[in-house]
Amino acid sequence: MATHPQTPTSSNAFSFISKGWREVRDSADADLRLMRDRANSFKDLATSFDRELENFFNSATPPFSVPAMRSPPPKEIEFVKSLRPKLSEIRRAYSSPDFSKKVLEKWRPRTQIRINLSAIKNAIVSAEEEEEGIVDFEKRRRRRLSFWEEWKGEGEGESRDWEPIRVLKTRLKEFEKRGSSFDAFKNSEFVEKVKSSLKSMCKEPLESKEVPPLDVPELLAYIVKQSGPFLDHLGVKRDICDKIVESLYSKCKNHQLLHSLSGEESSVLGNGNINDELDLRIASVLQSTGHRYEGGFWTDHAKHDPLDNERHVAIVTTASLPWMTGTAVNPLFRAAYLSQSAKQKVTLLVPWLCKSDQELVYPSNLTFTSPEEQEAYIRSWLEERIGFKADFKISFYPGKFSEARRSIIPAGDTSQFIPSRDADIAILEEPEHLNWYHHGKRWTDKFNHVVGIVHTNYLEYIKREKNGALQAFLVKHINNWVTRAYCHKVLRLSAATQDLPKSVICNVHGVNPKFLKIGEKIAAERELGQKAFTKGAYFLGKLVWAKGYKELIDLLAKHKADLDGFKLDVFGNGEDANEVQSAARRLDLNLNFQKGRDHADDSLHGYKVFINPSISDVLCTATAEALAMGKFVVCADHPSNEFFRSFPNCLTYRTSEDFVAKVKEALENEPYPLTPEQRYQLSWEAATQRFMEYSELDRILNKENNGEKASVDKGKLIAKSASMPNLTELVDGGLAFAHYCLTGNEFLRLCTGAIPGTRDYDKQHCKDLHLLPPLVENPIYGW
């Protein structure tokens, strides 16, 4: 097999290091030889100096006798005599045979260079690449001058008697210069890189702060805290869990928290609560051990990453126009108003029914042959009412109509109809309904943030059926199960719904702008002195018993005499139309039944009073529309009507006698005109603003912190969710996995009321939506 030549980078670097090392060694040997020669020359110089001095004294003594000099000797001779003992000492010192050895011992280089060549190999190579050159070791040799050249150059024109001292000073200056040049070399970028490389290889463990380990009360407190939602699911109140956590953690808080956290953290915790202190205590312990939580068994890491700073919102609902129901109309308006913001792109995902199901659901025998035809109908209907062209995408998923449940059930994995590149934020309209029989990818795994909006009070409907109490009990826990497993946040339109996990109460619905315009028109007519309301009372709603018809007939039958002459027009279509009309005729009630129509129809503008006795609604859209048109509304004192109580035209009753009084009051008086603030409160602009706030989408879309608290430790953030496994997420993932396993069994699906064959879509759906067969989309490998 042919071998490819290796890149020369490493070999060149090694040869460069070897060459440099040889040059350093040779340079050191040359320096030692030069110093030895200088010492010997210094010794010879001292000997010659002593010899010349003796000759000088001998020449000063005459060979013949001279008369004694009475005058004192000259000063020069006295100086020479005084200098003679010192010169003799210098001569003896320099004549000593150990002089060269002592000089070498004094001036020998003391720094021993011990470099691990293999350890700094990579650092040398990087230095070559960055500086595009090598260290020139010849510079030292170029700077080296001959001892004798300097001696001769500096000695010209001066007396040679003091030349040894002058040369000694010159040598000392030279060593100082060489020392400064060596310091510059030590501080060079190359040496710094070598030092950093050596430090990185021999790096000591990071300075770890002594953090006391967790004790048993702390562990128990944290387990109870993380198990709060699960215990709440079992019926244990959250207040009890908080008290248990506080009692367990307070025992060890004082003597361990201050040791495990820095001063800044302690000041932060001083203003916090027990839960925050416990979370930061756990985080600090995990950080001291170097642990970092990278995701659990149920976590999917392949989520959408908004690299282009553009977010995607997918709205998934359970119904579509022309079925005039709340889950068809309200999500459509939500998509239109969310698409007005440039921060996100919006996709509305609605069910597609085969033609046989369309005939059962859509009014006036209206059917569509293709999704494109139905999309055109939806957009046309919407633009007539909002007055602007909404820029959002409409997609379809397979669905089947259940006559027993009177609702549309998804067929197959609904999440697969949102591409992974757009899987960022999901809004599930009726999350419990969408996930009862959901057998597919977990929503919270595919999407970064999942918000559920509860539209329907299913428990109230189920209680009216046979064995309703038992069914309601089972459905209640199934709803808790699926909403907890598949949602990050749940919004309940009113307190009329069951208390679901992760839920808050907020009305995030508005009214069609057309109704607000009708209200403004009626108010203008009244200001001109015209009579806007020429008719009495009416009721509009789907003709099924659960929509308030039972309560209405009971009230009118009980107070038939009190409401003598009272006439009520009823508009609606539905499965129970014949039964409701038969009951009204049997009781001889003054009810005028008419076919259902749009609430904005011109024929309904003249009615002054809208009566809605329903207590099964979560938030009655018709009530909001009647208030927007400036009418009186008589409704029950019920949590579903809590949002409307602030409007002066909303008259609520508690008893049947109170109902009669409110009806008479409304018929005898004129409604109050709406203020601009009240009109805005009913609008979709205000509803969208409330939705962004309560669903936490405003912070997510603005890239703000998602609510996780952090504390500073030596300049670093300790994020609670980044360094510790979340027991709640682990439990939620287990619930989702169990739900996936159960919904994959066809027998269990049928036992719980699923439509046969809805685990996957059928051939007709493949044909209508141009889908691959389920076995091709999700193959099963085996024999």
From Swiss-Prot:
Name the enzyme group at the top EC level. Answer: transferase
**Listed Gene3D superfamilies:** Glycogen Phosphorylase B
* Subcellular location(s) per record: Plastid, Chloroplast outer membrane; Plastid outer membrane
Q: Mind listing the GO molecular function terms for this protein? A: digalactosyldiacylglycerol synthase activity; UDP-galactosyltransferase activity
Check the record and name the InterPro entries matching this protein.
DGDG1/2, Glyco_trans_1
Q: Which GO terms describe its biological process?
A: galactolipid biosynthetic process; nodulation
Report keywords, A-Z. Chloroplast, Glycosyltransferase, Membrane, Nodulation, Plastid, Plastid outer membrane, Transferase, Transit peptide
This protein's major location comes to plastid
GO cellular component terms listed in the entry, alphabetical order = chloroplast outer membrane
Recorded family membership: Belongs to the glycosyltransferase group 1 family. Glycosyltransferase 4 subfamily.
Protein name as catalogued? Digalactosyldiacylglycerol synthase 1, chloroplastic
